[in-house]
C-alpha cells in the first residue's frame, strides 16, 4: 500500500515508538523568537545542559519589535524579551537574525527566505503558525515552551502521528480571488475544528498553479481550521524558490530526493474534501473567529446560538448587514499570512493613484527586511506612501496586540492577518480577515467588491 506525503516524511524521522503511540521524532530545524524561548533557555541553565544542536537552531525577533523606531523599545517586558534572546543567542551559539539585520523579520518568513525551510524536513517553532513551512513539503508544527526546551536539549520531540486529510482543490481562481479566500472559505464551510487530529494535505490543479507565497498563505492558516499540520507536495515551483538561497547550499544533491516526496496514487487518506474554486468569491469575516465569514455578496447570517450573539455584540454588527455596510477605521497589510512581496505588489496595483480616506489609518508592514528591500527597489513604498499609507519596518505588528501597533477599541480593521478573536489586535478591536487585495480596496472606508477594481 502506498504512503501519503505526510507519512513518508514522518516515517523517515521516527527514532522510537510504535504507530498509534507517541513516537520520538528527530527535528531537522528549530526556529525560535523572543516570546516562547526565554523560559526554555533558562531551563537549560538550571539543569546545566547545553543546546544539543545550535547549528540547527535559528532565532529572529518579530512579535514585540516596534515597526517605527525599532531601536527604541519603550515597553519594559518587550525590551526584556528581546535583549534576553540576544543574550541567549550569544551564550548558546545560536544564529540570530537580529534587529536591523538584512534578514530579520517574522519567523515564518525568515525560514523560507533564507533557504532554511526545505522539503522533507521536520520543522518546529514555538508559534502556532509554523504550519506555514509545510508549503515546501515539510512537516512543520507549533510547539509549547516546555517542548521548545525538550528540542533544545535533545533535538527530538514526542508526537502522536495524526490522521491524513486530503483537500483536493481544483478550478481556476476568478479575478480578484486569491489563496487567502480559499483557506477562509474552507474554514467558513467546515469550521474551526474540522482539521483537529489530522494533517491537511492540499492538492489539486489550483494548488499546483499557486506561487509559493500563495501556498504558504494556505498552510499558514491550517491551524485556524484546527490542524497542527498543513503540507503541499514540493514541485519545480518549490525547487526554484529554494535554489540559490543562503542556507540551501545542499540544493544540487537534495533535489532528486525531494522529487520522491509525494503521495502515492494508492495512498489511503482518512478523509477527503473536494473544492471547486471556479465560482469562489472574495471572503470577509464578520465575527470573532475565522469560521464566522461570508462571501462578499452575502448578508451576515442569522443568530443561531449564544456564540453568534456574543460575536455580533462585540463587533457592533447585525444579521442581514453586508460587508459593504461596515464603517472601517483601519487597514492593515502585514502578518505571516500575507506580508510577502507578491501580496504587496497585488495591493499596490489597487492602491496606485488612490488616496486613503481621512478617517482611515492605513499601514503596510513588510513581513521581513528582505521583502522590504525588494519592495522598495520596485518603488512600492512610494506608491503606498503617496496614497497615504504608513510604510513600516518588519515585524508581526498589528496581527496581535502585544506590541505598539494596535487597533483602537471599537474600531473596525480590514486585516490581512489570520485571527479575528476578541482583543486580538488590541482591546476591543474589531478585526475583519480579508485578502491583501480586499484590504487595499478598502482604503476609502468601506469594503468593496475587489473583483470590480482589480487591475
From Swiss-Prot:
<dbReference type="GO" id="GO:0051539">
    <property type="term" value="F:4 iron, 4 sulfur cluster binding"/>
</dbReference>
<keyword id="KW-0004">4Fe-4S</keyword>
<feature type="binding site">
    <location>
        <position position="336"/>
    </location>
    <ligand>
        <name>[4Fe-4S] cluster</name>
    </ligand>
</feature>
<dbReference type="InterPro" id="IPR018136">
    <property type="entry name" value="Aconitase_4Fe-4S_BS"/>
</dbReference>
<comment type="function">
    <text>Catalyzes the isomerization between 2-isopropylmalate and 3-isopropylmalate, via the formation of 2-isopropylmaleate.</text>
</comment>
<keyword id="KW-0479">Metal-binding</keyword>
<comment type="subunit">
    <text>Heterodimer of LeuC and LeuD.</text>
</comment>
<keyword id="KW-0411">Iron-sulfur</keyword>
<keyword id="KW-0028">Amino-acid biosynthesis</keyword>
<dbReference type="InterPro" id="IPR050067">
    <property type="entry name" value="IPM_dehydratase_rel_enz"/>
</dbReference>
<dbReference type="InterPro" id="IPR001030">
    <property type="entry name" value="Acoase/IPM_deHydtase_lsu_aba"/>
</dbReference>
<dbReference type="Pfam" id="PF00330">
    <property type="entry name" value="Aconitase"/>
</dbReference>
<keyword id="KW-0456">Lyase</keyword>
<comment type="similarity">
    <text>Belongs to the aconitase/IPM isomerase family. LeuC type 1 subfamily.</text>
</comment>
<comment type="pathway">
    <text>Amino-acid biosynthesis; L-leucine biosynthesis; L-leucine from 3-methyl-2-oxobutanoate: step 2/4.</text>
</comment>
<dbReference type="InterPro" id="IPR015931">
    <property type="entry name" value="Acnase/IPM_dHydase_lsu_aba_1/3"/>
</dbReference>
<dbReference type="GO" id="GO:0046872">
    <property type="term" value="F:metal ion binding"/>
</dbReference>
<dbReference type="GO" id="GO:0009098">
    <property type="term" value="P:L-leucine biosynthetic process"/>
</dbReference>
<dbReference type="InterPro" id="IPR004430">
    <property type="entry name" value="3-IsopropMal_deHydase_lsu"/>
</dbReference>
<protein>
    <recommendedName>
        <fullName>3-isopropylmalate dehydratase large subunit</fullName>
        <ecNumber>4.2.1.33</ecNumber>
    </recommendedName>
</protein>
<feature type="binding site">
    <location>
        <position position="399"/>
    </location>
    <ligand>
        <name>[4Fe-4S] cluster</name>
    </ligand>
</feature>
<dbReference type="InterPro" id="IPR036008">
    <property type="entry name" value="Aconitase_4Fe-4S_dom"/>
</dbReference>
<keyword id="KW-0100">Branched-chain amino acid biosynthesis</keyword>
<feature type="binding site">
    <location>
        <position position="396"/>
    </location>
    <ligand>
        <name>[4Fe-4S] cluster</name>
    </ligand>
</feature>
<keyword id="KW-0408">Iron</keyword>
<dbReference type="GO" id="GO:0003861">
    <property type="term" value="F:3-isopropylmalate dehydratase activity"/>
</dbReference>
<dbReference type="InterPro" id="IPR033941">
    <property type="entry name" value="IPMI_cat"/>
</dbReference>
<keyword id="KW-0432">Leucine biosynthesis</keyword>
Amino acid at each position: 500500500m502506498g504512503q501519503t506525503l505526510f507519512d513518508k516524511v514522518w516515517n523517515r524521522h521516527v527514532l522510537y515508538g510504535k504507530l498509534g503511540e507517541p513516537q520520538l521524532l528527530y527535528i531537522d530545524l528549530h526556529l525560535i523568537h523572543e516570546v516562547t524561548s526565554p523560559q526554555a533557555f533558562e531551563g537549560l541553565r538550571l539543569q546545566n545542559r547545553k543546546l544539543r544542536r545550535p547549528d540547527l537552531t535559528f532565532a529572529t525577533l518579530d512579535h514585540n519589535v516596534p515597526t517605527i523606531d525599532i531601536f527604541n523599545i519603550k515597553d519594559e517586558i518587550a525590551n526584556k524579551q528581546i535583549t534576553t534572546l540576544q543574550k541567549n543567542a550569544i551564550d548558546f551559539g545560536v544564529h540570530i537574525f537580529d534587529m536591523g539585520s538584512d534578514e530579520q523579520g517574522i519567523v515564518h518568513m525568515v525560514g523560507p527566505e533564507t533557504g532554511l525551510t526545505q522539503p522533507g524536513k521536520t520543522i518546529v517553532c514555538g508559534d502556532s503558525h509554523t504550519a506555514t513551512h509545510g508549503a515546501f513539503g515539510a512537516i512543520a508544527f507549533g510547539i509549547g515552551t516546555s517542548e521548545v526546551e525538550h528540542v533544545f536539549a535533545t533535538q527530538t520531540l514526542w508526537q502522536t502521528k495524526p490522521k491524513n486529510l486530503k483537500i483536493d482543490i481544483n478550478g481556476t481562481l476568478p479575478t480578484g480571488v486569491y489563496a487567502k479566500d480559499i483557506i477562509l472559505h474552507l474554514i467558513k464551510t467546515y469550521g474551526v475544528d474540522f482539521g483537529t487530529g489530522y494533517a491537511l494535505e492540499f492538492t489539486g490543479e489550483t494548488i499546483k498553479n499557486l506561487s509559493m507565497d500563495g501556498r504558504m498563505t494556505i498552510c499558514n492558516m491550517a491551524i485556524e481550521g484546527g490542524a497542527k499540520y498543513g503540507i503541499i507536495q514540493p514541485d519545480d515551483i518549490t525547487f526554484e524558490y529554494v535554489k540559490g538561497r543562503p542556507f540551501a547550499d545542499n540544493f544540487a544533491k537534495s533535489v532528486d530526493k525531494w522529487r520522491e516526496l509525494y503521495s502515492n496514487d494508492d495512498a489511503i487518506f482518512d478523509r477527503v474534501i473536494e473544492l471547486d474554486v471556479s465560482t469562489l468569491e472574495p471572503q470577509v469575516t464578520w465575527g470573532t473567529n475565522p469560521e464566522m465569514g461570508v462571501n462578499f455578496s452575502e448578508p451576515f447570517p442569522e443568530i443561531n446560538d449564544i456564540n453568534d450573539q456574543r460575536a455580533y455584540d462585540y463587533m457592533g454588527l447585525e444579521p442581514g448587514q453586508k460587508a459593504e455596510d461596515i464603517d472601517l477605521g483601519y487597514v492593515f497589510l502585514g502578518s505571516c499570512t500575507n506580508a510577502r512581496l507578491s501580496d504587496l505588489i497585488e495591493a499596490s496595483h489597487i492602491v496606485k493613484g488612490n488616496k486613503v480616506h481621512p478617517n482611515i489609518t492605513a499601514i503596510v508592514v513588510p513581513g521581513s527586511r528582505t521583502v522590504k528591500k525588494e519592495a522598495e527597489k520596485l518603488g512600492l513604498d512610494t506608491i503606498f506612501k503617496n496614497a497615504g499609507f504608513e510604510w513600516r519596518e518588519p515585524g508581526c505588528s498589528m496581527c496581535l496586540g502585544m506590541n505598539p501597533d494596535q487597533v483602537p477599541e471599537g474600531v473596525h480593521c480590514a486585516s490581512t492577518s489570520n485571527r479575528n478573536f476578541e482583543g486580538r489586535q488590541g482591546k476591543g478591536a474589531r478585526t475583519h480577515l480579508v485578502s491583501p487585495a480586499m484590504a487595499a480596496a478598502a482604503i476609502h472606508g468601506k469594503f468593496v467588491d475587489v473583483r470590480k477594481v482589480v487591475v
